[in-house]
A protein has these predicted regions:
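Serine-hydrolase catalytic machinery in alpha/beta-hydrolase-like enzymes
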Residues: 5-95, 192
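Acidic catalytic loop of the alpha/beta-hydrolase fold
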Residues: 156-161, 188
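Short beta-strand/loop motif that positions the catalytic acidic residue
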Residues: 145-147, 152-154, 158
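Core-facing hydrophobic residues within beta-strands of well-ordered domains
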Residues: 119, 176-177
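Primarily recognizes the serine-hydrolase "nucleophile elbow" in alpha/beta-hydrolase
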Residues: 81-148
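Short alpha-helix in the alpha/beta-hydrolase fold that links the catalytic acid
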Residues: 39, 139, 148, 162-170
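Catalytic histidine-centered segment of alpha/beta-hydrolase-like enzymes
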Residues: 185-196
Length: 208
C-alpha cells in the first residue's frame, strides 16, 4: 500500500488514501511516533479495506523527536487530534474513526468524551488502563461519558491492565463497544497471534 506526507494546521503525518468514503485519524503512544511499524501496518490494512487513514504525530512529538509527553501538555495533544479529525473531514464524506495506541488511545478517548459528536467511532489499541503494578490508579473517569462506538484491542499480557480488569472497566461504557484480546501479546502488541483483519472486521461490526 502507499502513503504520502501530509501537513495541515497543527497536523503532521502520512496519508493513506483509499477509494471509500470513511476516514480514520490514527496516532501513536508516548514513546513513539506515527512511523511506528504497528501503525503503518494498521493503516495499510484499513486502506486496503477502503478507509482513508491519516497517521499523525501528536503535538508533543512534533515539538520533540524523542522523550515522553508532559502531563501538562495533554490538552494540546487532544487539540492536535481534534485538528487531525477536522483535516480528515475535509477529505472524506463518510464516517470518521479516531484511533490511537496507548497514550494516543487515552487522549483519543478523552477527546471523544469531551466532544461526543466529534467522531462516529473509536479504535483504542492497548489502552493504558492503569500504570503497571498500580491497579488502584484506574484511568476510566471519562468512560461513562463516551458516546462513540468503541473498539478496544488489548494484549493478554499487557502490564497496563489485565484482560479481566479491562472487561470490568468497559462495563461502565453505555455506548456500543467491543473488546478484542490478542493472546500472548504485551502492551506493544508485537507478540501473539495478531491478524489485522480482526481489527477491520471488528470495526465493521461496530459501525454496521
Amino acid at each position: 500500500m502507499t502513503s504520502a506526507p501530509f501537513a495541515a494546521e497543527d497536523v503532521r503525518g502520512y496519508l493513506h488514501k483509499a477509494g471509500g468514503v470513511d476516514g480514520m485519524a490514527l496516532t501513536h503512544g508516548a514513546g513513539g511516533n506515527c512511523k511506528a511499524p504497528l501503525l503503518l501496518a494498521v493503516a495499510d490494512a484499513f486502506q486496503a479495506a477502503g478507509v482513508t487513514v491519516l497517521r499523525c504525530d501528536l503535538p508533543f512529538r512534533q515539538q520533540r523527536p524523542s522523550g515522553p509527553p508532559r502531563p501538562a501538555d495533554a490538552a494540546k495533544d487532544r487539540a492536535g487530534l481534534r485538528a487531525a479529525v477536522a483535516a480528515m473531514r475535509e477529505l472524506v464524506t463518510g464516517r470518521m474513526v479516531l484511533a490511537g495506541l496507548s497514550y494516543g488511545s487515552r487522549q483519543a478517548s478523552m477527546l471523544a468524551a469531551e466532544e461526543p459528536q466529534l467522531v462516529e467511532a473509536l479504535m483504542l489499541l492497548s489502552y493504558p488502563l492503569h500504570p503497571p503494578g498500580k491497579p488502584a490508579q484506574m484511568r476510566t473517569g471519562h468512560f461513562p461519558e463516551l458516546r462513540s462506538r468503541a473498539l478496544f484491542v488489548h494484549g493478554s499480557k499487557d502490564p497496563f491492565g489485565s484482560v479481566g480488569e479491562m472487561a470490568s472497566a468497559l462495563r461502565i461504557i453505555t455506548a456500543p463497544h467491543e473488546l478484542i484480546v490478542i493472546e500472548g501479546a504485551g502492551h506493544d502488541l508485537r507478540r501473539g497471534r495478531f491478524d489485522l483483519n480482526v481489527l477491520t472486521g471488528g470495526l465493521s461490526r461496530l459501525l454496521a
